[in-house]
A protein has these predicted regions:
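Membrane-proximal juxtamembrane linkers immediately C-terminal to transmembrane helices
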Residues: 33-43
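Positively charged n-region of N-terminal signal peptides that target proteins for export
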Residues: 1-5, 9
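Leucine-rich, highly hydrophobic segment in Treponema pallidum outer-membrane-associated proteins
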Residues: 8-20, 159-279, 407-452
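Membrane-interface motif at the C-terminal end of an N-terminal transmembrane signal
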Residues: 16-35
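Single conserved position on a long alpha-helix in the C-terminal lobe of the eukaryotic protein kinase
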Residues: 45, 75-177, 305-410
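Interface amphipathic segments
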Residues: 32-33, 235-259, 371-374, 382-400
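Extended non-catalytic domains of envelope/secretory-pathway proteins
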Residues: 252-310, 317-321, 332-337
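Short extracytoplasmic
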Residues: 42-66
Length: 452
């Protein structure tokens, strides 16, 4: 055998042994607690605590400030192994991780007012709605939805005893992602308001659970950036995503919060050609029916077809605390106003109709809701009743702004104050209140979220 062949064979054997050792290390360090993950998980995130701390050891981050101050190395939790946070099918939130010292963990929980009992071969700790079960190797924590959420202890013990084959199906997907903080979720893990909207838009016989979202997040000092991807095994959903790409054009420029009314809590920026968007809207059965109803009173099809250019959807938070919508769209023409005298002016409660307030200002009643719309400077503005004062100066502010350049098909800005109530109190107070969350879609399948 030649010397070269011996070298090649030796190299192949070395590579094989390296992969085998890595696989052995992965299994030996992880399988003893990953098997605890419930089989009905709809969202799963992996958190490399040690990497997050190393990355920010010279400056405090959201994670190190909130998490490590509460759970130091005296907790008995093994932070050199990743933590896995999840949402199950009942929308309960939980965490799974490795235990470095069960006695230390038990002492830590006792000092923090947890009630600890034995359940089978495990320690069961409870405090209000938080339940935590652990042994010498692993722990499993979960938040009860309410006091009526019964059977939680049996559910947790069953998960602690299950085999790896019965555990979370999303685990293999998250293993393909790199990052300090990674996430895999089915779209039915999103808030109810979003899944309800998706049910309307998605093709027949498809559901939010048929969409998978994967993302990786990196934390920086007082902010973060998340890169994400949307995918589906359903052919009809992929066709819908392709139609979205063909319908929505790059935004090019968008107005920042600095240039508009301070009562605005969030903005969605789009760029559409009205005729193409109308065809897309008609492909959605519920939207098509709504358009048919509107067209019995006003020329909704012609109004939509007249749009060409930037479209912005504003959510204004009034002093009363209620949220209200404003839509502003650039018009190619105002031809739909030619037939204004033919629009039905019968405003009987519960019907669809309109009231002419001036030559270019109107009130529409549709689906038991009132809206005002006006034409200003070749733009269409549609607003809910409480937003009239906000709408008055909005168009001028938008036109006076140079805008920020982008090539994304959708840009959404959200003020931190508008979402911080969704988080637990320690995180609410940590980040500065003048922050803005920016969500951008480069196409229908790729997005990023960052804090500015």
């Amino acid at each position: 055998m030649g010397k070269k062949k011996v070298v090649y064979i030796f190299a192949l054997v070395l590579v094989f042994l390296t992969f085998a050792w890595c696989a052995f290390r992965r299994c030996s360090t992880n399988e003893h607690y990953l098997s605890v993950l419930p089989s009905d998980v709809i969202a799963l995130s992996r958190i490399h605590v040690d990497e997050l701390v190393k990355a920010k050891e010279n400056s405090p981050s959201l994670f190190t400030t909130f998490f490590l101050q509460r759970f130091s190395n005296k907790s008995g939790i093994k932070f050199s192994s990743p933590l896995y946070a999840f949402m199950d099918a009942e929308r309960r939130l939980g965490v799974v991780g490795a235990v470095s010292n069960a006695s230390t963990l038990k002492s830590f929980l006792t000092k923090n007012h947890f009630k600890i009992e034995r359940n089978n071969d495990f320690n069961m700790a409870t405090w209000n709605y938080l339940h935590l079960v652990f042994d010498d190797e692993k722990f499993f924590a979960i938040f009860k939805l309410s006091s009526s959420d019964t059977g939680i202890e049996d559910y947790m013990v069953k998960s602690m005893m299950q085999s790896e084959q019965a555990s979370c199906a999303l685990q293999s997907a998250i293993d393909t992602l790199d990052g300090q903080f990674t996430l895999v979720a089915h779209a039915n893990a999103l808030p109810q308001s979003m899944t309800d909207l998706m049910e309307v838009i998605l093709p027949k016989d498809t559901h939010p659970k048929d969409i998978t979202i994967t993302s990786s997040l990196s934390l920086h000092e007082k902010d973060f950036r998340l890169e994400g991807k949307i995918s589906s095994d359903k052919t009809e959903i992929n066709k819908l995503l392709d139609r979205i790409d063909n319908t929505f054009r790059p935004v090019e420029k968008y107005v920042s919060f600095d240039a508009i009314n301070p009562s605005i809590a969030s903005i969605i920026h789009l760029n559409v050609e009205g005729k193409e968007f109308l065809q897309f809207a008609r492909s959605i059965p519920d939207v098509r029916l709504a358009l048919l109803a509107l067209n019995m009173c006003i020329d909704a099809d012609m109004m939509i077809s007249s749009v060409n250019g930037p479209v912005s959807i504003y959510n204004a938070k009034e002093s009363s605390g209620t949220g209200n919508m404003i839509l502003s769209a650039s018009l190619e023409n105002t031809d739909f106003l030619r037939n204004i005298d033919d629009w039905d002016d019968n405003m009987t409660s519960g019907t669809i109709g309109y009231e002419k307030l001036s030559d270019k200002e109107f009130r529409i009643e549709a689906f038991e809701k009132n809206f005002w719309f006006s034409i200003q400077n070749q733009s269409l503005h549609l607003a809910s009743p409480n937003c009239i004062n906000t709408l008055a100066g909005l168009a001028v502010s938008a036109q006076n702004s140079n805008g920020k350049e982008t090539q994304n098909i959708m840009v959404m800005q959200v003020k931190w104050d508008a979402v911080k109530e969704m988080l637990i109190p320690p995180l609410q107070d940590y980040l500065k209140q003048d922050k803005t969350i920016l969500l951008q879609f480069s196409d229908s399948r790729h997005f990023n979220i960052q804090m500015q």
